[in-house]
């Protein structure tokens, strides 16, 4: 069972969810953007949210700044999370200002905001589950899209919630997090898009 839960944690890793979210967005939301524009944007998202974070973790492990790719301790998480806050904010700015795809910009502003809340928690020696944070963001994002486009994305929302439950169970079984860290991660992720949408 431990091996299964490890596989689940890898497949639904936080750096994978943003790319999946953007792919779902392009599938579900009608737009007049050319396929080449969508592909360019998807490539930018993949590089910024997957390849760069992966490279950062590899470099940090080589430099012995982290012991494992999970960056388990609060101290190990500080610098990677700080870099992710900046990366996601710059990505949101780039997408909003160059393509006008404000919905996707919202997704990454929200991610930056949720990571900022996570970073603030470090000062209180609180760690949050980034796996659950990413799924909380995805859940809330598609709820907001439902309001914006007067459509129901209930299937996506329900699947997100079910996956969050599976991942939460996996992280708890692997003793990667405590229940409070799992709940806090999903909570920060869920409220971030709502907050960004309300204020922007």
Identify the function of each model-found stretch.
Residues 14, 18-19, 49-58, 89, ...:
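Transmembrane alpha-helical segments of multi-pass membrane transport proteins and ion-pumping complexes
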